[in-house]
Amino acid sequence: MNNYEVRQIRNLGEADPFILDIHYAKRKPSISYIYGLFDNDSYEEDRIIMIPELIGICSFGMSASPNLSYIAGEKHKNKVIELNRLVLKYNRKNEASFLVSKSLKQLPRPKIVVSYADTAQDHLGIVYQASNFMFTGTTKERTDMAACKGKH
């Protein structure tokens, strides 16, 4: 991981290929903060300079569920944020937990971070647990109605 760097992405459009093309949901969530995993040993050619390759993103934003902000009570509702996208180009060993842990360290404080593992996609939340998230259980089973182009 010595060749990797995690830094905030200021141009949200830079993450679009990850969110819209690679991630299974194919849609943008609410994004307040987004961090990129850059491989300093692999470069993408720009017209003038060589830039480290962006190989993953981790984004945080307001939850689609308004009730989530109240998990810590009225007093702390503005501190709650959801880790809503974790996308890797290659998904090599330890990249996910490295990106999550380094992204969490860069978030403005204080924050209460919540994330969900989509069991319908065979995600078990192991990356989050490896990043010291506290497992609090599963949500109620639900049925998602898919409209055209995979949107809810």
Question: Where are the language model's segments positioned?
Answer:
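Conserved beta-hairpin
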Residues: 19, 32-58
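Short amphipathic alpha-helix that is part of the acyltransferase structural core
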Residues: 1-30
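An active-site-proximal beta-strand-loop segment
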Residues: 25-31, 41, 67
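Acyl-donor binding region in acyl/amide transferases
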Residues: 8-9, 59-152
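Alpha-helix C-caps/helix-loop-beta hinges
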Residues: 22, 40, 130-131
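A generic structural signal for short, non-catalytic loop/turn and secondary-structure boundary residues
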Residues: 1-2, 51-53, 76
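Short, solvent-exposed polar/charged micro-motifs at secondary-structure junctions
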Residues: 15-18, 46, 125, 147-149
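Short, flexible, glycine/charge-rich loop motifs used to bind or transfer phosphoryl groups or to couple energy/partner
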Residues: 24-26, 48, 72-73
